[in-house]
From Swiss-Prot:
Cell location: Cytoplasm
Gene: deoB
GO cellular component, one term: cytosol
Pfam families xrefs: Metalloenzyme
Organism: Streptococcus thermophilus (strain ATCC BAA-491 / LMD-9)
Family per record: Belongs to the phosphopentomutase family.
UniProt key word Mitochondrion: no
Listed CDD domains: PPM
Binding site for Mn(2+) 1: D13, D339, H340
Protein name: Phosphopentomutase
Keywords for the protein's UniProt record, in alphabetical order: Cytoplasm, Isomerase, Manganese, Metal-binding
Amino acid sequence: MSKFNRMHLIVLDSVGIGAAPDANNFVNAGVPDGASDTLGHISKTVGLNVPNMAKLGLGNIPREQPLKTVPAESNPTGYATKLEEVSLGKDTMTGHWEIMGLNITEPFDTFWNGFPEEILTQIEEFSGRKVIRESNRPYSGTAVIDDFGPRQMETGELIIYTSADPVLQIAAHEDIIPVEELYRICEFARSITLERPALLGRIIARPYVGEPGNFTRTSNRRDLAISPFAPTVLDKLNEAGIDTYSVGKISDIFNGEGINHDMGHNKSNNHGVDNLIKAMTSEDFKHGFSFTNLVDFDALYGHRRNPQGYRDCLHEFDERLPEIIAAMKEDDLLMITADHGNDPTYAGTDHTREYIPFLAYSPSFKCSGLIPVGHFADISATIADNFGVEKAMIGESFLDKLV
């Protein structure tokens, strides 16, 4: 019998808690990540008021300098620690795959200066359409269609862009480039980005509609991912017949592997919380695991180096946390963590190599406090231990610490 009948893991995308020991091996605009500290710098520069996460023990997590505006709790209601990444990467897929038990020794390729001409030329030859070279760089998905949508409507050229993650995205106005044609082009792009020097995690079709100045992305997005290179704990749970619920982009990150209930993409963090609560309160979800990604911290504020917006986004999530807790059953476990850092006060616009926070809460807890500092994959090892399945490649369970 499982110690916790249901386990819920929420990834606050990019909410790091201080530079990892190997942070200086990773850079942002030529600056090593060694001084990065997402939560620390937000707390120090613009203030952070997250009483519900603080109550669980966020301010108790060991740090050289305590979080300036998140007080430590003398009697927290949950368990807290920080976790270190061992994989060679600081992107979304690497972080999530390691959380689910894999050790990524060869990171995916990212393209901060845009994709090489060879890739663009191959896509042009396959599609019969030109590629807009000026969009070929890391770009906001809404800004790129605002900037180049009018030109695409006139010329039929492809808008190709990337991000901090190992992705190639193609935006196309549905009235100019039909969705099925866009999908075919993306499938070709997927076929030529499966190995180095362009090993990409995902190809994303980004259809949109509207007129210049009023473009809107549609729900016809399609992600062409690659599956994890080895079974994750999600696969182990699925094979054992245990329910696994995906909220947000989790299913895309794992290419659907090990997911048997997908709640769909989130329109926003708040929509993601709504979807999580919908799953938690479903009569069908009696036993199993839910896995949620809330990406707004990263996509809207981290890469754009907006500490005020990032802080407000954290406040917004913290205000919803009591609703999530209210949806829990007595023998549920809630876990809150991250997948990497993205310090909005730091150099550059890329992710930062950081520890991630880990908070755990159950209505059944008799005790609380700190658990030892560990590694990302300890989360999945703990999940596997709870449900009686094998862990994946790496990770050590701390299930016995949660009492």
